[in-house]
Each structure stands twice: as C-alpha cells, then as structure tokens.
Amino acid sequence: MNADKTQAIWLGSQKYSRAKYMPHLKMVWNPTMFKILGIWFTQDLKECATINYNKNFDEVKKLFKIWSLRTITPLGRVAILKSLILSKLIHLWILLPDPPDNFVKDLQKICFQFVWNGKQDRIARKTTIKDVKSGGLNIPDIKTYILALKLTWIKKLKISNHKWRNIPMELYPFLHQLECYGPCFFNQTVKNNSFRADVFKAYGIFCSKVKPNSTSQLLSEPVFYNKNMMIGNKMIKYTQWVDNGVYCIAHFIKENGRFCTLAEFNTKSGMTVDFLTFNSCTSSIKQYIKKSTILISNNMADEVNISLSTIYSAPKGARLYYNILVNDNCMPNCCLKWSEKLKSNISWNTVFIKVQKIKDVKLKWLQMRIIHRIIATNIVLNKMGVTANTQCGFCNDKKDSIEHMFWKCAYIRRFWTSLETILKEKCETALNVKFTQNLVLFGTEIDIKTDTVFDLVILQAKQFIYKCKLDKCLPTLSCFLQQLMLKHKIDEYNAKISGELPTFIVNWLCYKPILKTENG
C-alpha cells in the first residue's frame, strides 16, 4: 500500500469520528472529498450528485466558450457538442441520480445557443432534437438523453454476469420477473434509492412510448400496474396472481383467441377467483384490446413484453432508446409547407435518408437549409435591410425564393439544361436523366433512380449556384465542371487515404467523361 496516495474516511454510523489508526503511515484521514473512478464522494452521499454536476458543469462551460470562437456549421457544432463537450457528463448521468431540473434547463439552453452561435433558433427545437433521417439535426435533448442512458441499466440487469448484479437482485427479488409487472409497480416499490428510482422512472416513460403492433406483442403485455388496464380509474394490483403464473393478457385467453370463462380460468390458474373480480379484470383487458385494434386469434404471447424486448435486443449504447423517446411520428413543419407550396407528393423519408448519407458537411448543411426553408433569399434579406429589393439576383425579373433560385429562374434553367445535355452525351448511364424541380431541390423524384455520384453532382451544382448568387455572377457550365473536377480530386485523395479507392473508382467510372470534357 502506498501511504502517500492512500486516504481513509469513516462512513456509516461513525462518519463523524475523528479517530485515526496507524498514524505512522501518515495517511490522509477524513478528507472532505475523495475521487473513485471519476466520481467525487463525500461522507454525505446525498451531496455527491450536486458536487459532481457542479464541478463538471464548470468545465463544460469553459469548453463551450473555447469552441464558440470557431467558425463551424451547425452540423459541425452538433458533432463537437456530442463528442467533446457532453462526453464530460455522460459518465455522471449513467452512474448518479438525475441532475436537478435547473441544471438540465441551463445546460439545454447553452446547447441550443452554441449550435446556433448565439443567434435565434432557425429550426423548431422539437425537430432539431431528432436524428437526421427524421428531419432533425441530432441536437441532444438533455432530459431525454439522461432517460435513455438510465435505461441501459435495465439491459445490464438482464444480461450482465458481473457480481454487482447480485446486490439489486437481492434487495429487490421482483427484478427476476420484470416481465410480470407494469412499469408503475417499480415506481411505487423502489423509492428509498433515488438512482434506482430514476432508472425505473425512465423505464415507465419508455413503456408509454413503445406500443404493441402484433398479436403476440399485445398478449405479452402485463396486466398488473399497467395504466392501460384500469378498474374504476385504478390500476389492477392482483400481484399475488403472479405466483400462480398469471400476469399477462395471454393468461386470460384460450387457444382459439377467446376469453376464458371464470371456471376455465380458475381451473387453468389453480386459483379461486370470484366472479366480480374476474369480470372487472377481463372487462378492462377487453377495452384495451379494442383500443389497440389488434385482432386476437390465439394465445401465443412473446416471452417478454414489447418494451423489454426492445431494450434487451437493442445494440450497445442508448441511441435506439433516445430515438424512440424523442420520436413523435410528426413530420417537420417544412415538409407541410413544401407539399402545400409545390402541390406534389414527396417521399420525405427518402429525402431525409439521402441527407443522412451525405458525407460532406457543407453540402449536407446546404441541403438541410433548402429542405427546412432557412436558406437566405432576397425576400428575407430585404426584410432584414440587407438588400434593396426582393428580386432574383440572377434575372432581376421575378421575386426571389428558394425554388426560383435553384430551379425556376431562366438563367438557372439554362444551366440545368446544359448540365443535363452533357450528362446524356458523355455518360451512358444518364441517357434517361431529366432534371425536375423535386429532383433538384430534394434529390429525389418518383420513378427516377439515382446513384451516389449523380446525387453528388446535383449537390455540387446547387452549392455552385448559391455561391454564384453570393458573388453576384451568372453560373456557367464550364466553371461548374472546373469545381466538380477539383471536388473529384479531393474526394479521390481522401478515398486513397481511407482505403476506399477501388469503390471510388467504380462509382465515378461512368461520370469520368464529363471531367475529361473540361480537361479538353
């Protein structure tokens, strides 16, 4: 034992003792704080969470100030936020009770300010907290993120073989039968430990988000302490039935999908349940089944309910839990505005999946600004007093708008026609290509298949058009092909470094002729 690096502290009933043993070792006795595995502890465990959050929050604020000085796109700021800043707090959120609400509120406010560089949010927060393929920016919703991290303990309780698991299992024997009870049971049972209470609070919220969508999933739903099945506005609490193997909907159903009679149920379960209790219980179950609109034709249930099976089968980490918790099945407002404005059917799922696959951060951010209708046009700039009028900067004939800037303007249409012509002349795979408004704006069109390089060409063309607008010059095909050739060289070099050169060469094989055109 290295006495110089050893500290001793009294805990429990003797925590205020001043006794010191082995004084010859010159150990530090009763330090005000001590650190184990990155967590600061004191004699009063209730203070641990506050002390750790305050210490790390100060460090996080310094990182925000440092990175705020950099000129980075919002997508780049999100990456920094998740990988370099919030990573300082993740281990605390996993291991300690949830931080106080004011801590979460302050941190969330700073996160949004950082992403938007201290300016007003340009996209609704309920959208930005979603992942990119759902139309968001992946800005972490701190409260939900903490819930998702706490949910990882439910999976650990099931699959871990480490000895720490024996402690909660010994303290709470019902953890061996998680599938037998609804989430409210754990909320009411685990109250004397704030950390474990937070874990099961997260589980309860998760259960409210995950709904069964098949017969077997519905039949595996627990009946007891489940808010979906109530008797007189009170949850069913016949937990003593669990000892007789009765806890989910399937145990009230016969093989043909019909409900058991009272006599059949008593025979099957080995219990003696009175008619009133049985009838009230089955009535609440029938109401729940009716609301679910799922037909019951058998009594074959999954081993565990849908919430637990989702948790157990999730890949490592908390990403899946977080995405489920933040998902509200609502499309971003921009989708409704575009559909109303263009009067066309757009597969927004396809649009956002394509955005997610864009590797170049600047191109991805340009595309997201177009989709979310936040890219600067002269109409907006005129209201801000930046431009003298609202007319298009190219034709000076029509009012500027996103669709006009990238498609409807006569000069821009001429540019797209020239690009379409050279693609058809030089690229065999592009013989049937025809640029449309949806294909240009959103990268997808019904009945038109594209590949990775073609999508990149469209993105590069839009970036070129926007740069020409800022530089107040007309876009020409020759200048664009020069920029495309430069982009090709950069991507080729990156592919060579990353060992992806063969794939890169194959992808570009059909499009090399348009680059040779520019080379002369």
Can you name each region flagged by the protein language model?
Residues 34-44, 85-97, 134-144, 367, ...:
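Short, conserved catalytic/metal-binding micro-motifs enriched in Asp/Glu and His
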Residues 25-98, 118, 151-159:
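Basic, alpha-helical interaction scaffolds
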Residues 93, 107, 120-376, 469, ...:
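Extended C-terminal regions of large enzymes
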Residues 2-32:
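Short, conserved micro-motifs composed of acidic
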Residues 85, 104-115:
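Short amphipathic alpha-helical coiled-coil/interface segments
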Residues 384-439:
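Short Cys/His-based metal-binding microdomains
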Residues 45-52, 69-76, 95-103, 355-360, ...:
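Conserved, non-catalytic sequence blocks in retroelement Pol enzymes and Pol-derived host proteins
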Residues 424-470:
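Long, charge-rich boundary regions
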